[in-house]
Amino acid sequence: MIAKITFDQFLVKCPEDGLYELVNGEIVEIISTRNHIDVADYIRDSFHTQIKNLSLNYVVTSKTAIRTLTQAGVEQGRRPDVSVIDRDLWRSNRSAYAALREPIQLAVEVTSTNWDDDYIDKLDEYQRLGISEYWVVDYLGIASSKFIGNPKVPTIFVYLLDAEGNYQTTAFKGSDRIVSRTFPELTLIAEQVMNV
């Protein structure tokens, strides 16, 4: 039986050759297809352009671990495909590991075969932590029809935290312009992201 580890132990024991998450006390490697990486990079680059052009006080990265809690209180170490972080928070302790316990501004998860993690587990954990905006990018339309409808088509879900701390969601498909609270001037079209 493998001994369960804490988030702090995860930061120390996490291998440096690749990307890993702490899931239910175990270190789990994240392996992505090239298409998955292309979609995440396109979104990250689009956010970076907004930050630079509008002089916004954010940092965008794909290398940050975030401490979350499950409903049962189990520590997780999540690593969103794209993280948008308040620059002051990011720079508050620059010698620390690239890990945060505080809520970030925006998390993006690009779905893969373990899509239920993004639609169920991470959705709950990110809401519980208080992440203001969360995107689930189902560029292949692989989630259950319960989530993306029937017929199943590629969809981007944007979850926004409301005043009561609950996510409200909007789905974007095809030629829909993605509406973002964090980046109100963003002009991304859903199919642009899906067809990278």
Q: Which role does the model predict for each range below?
A:
Residues M1-V196:
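Gly/Pro/Ser/Thr-rich low-complexity, intrinsically disordered segments predominantly at protein N-termini
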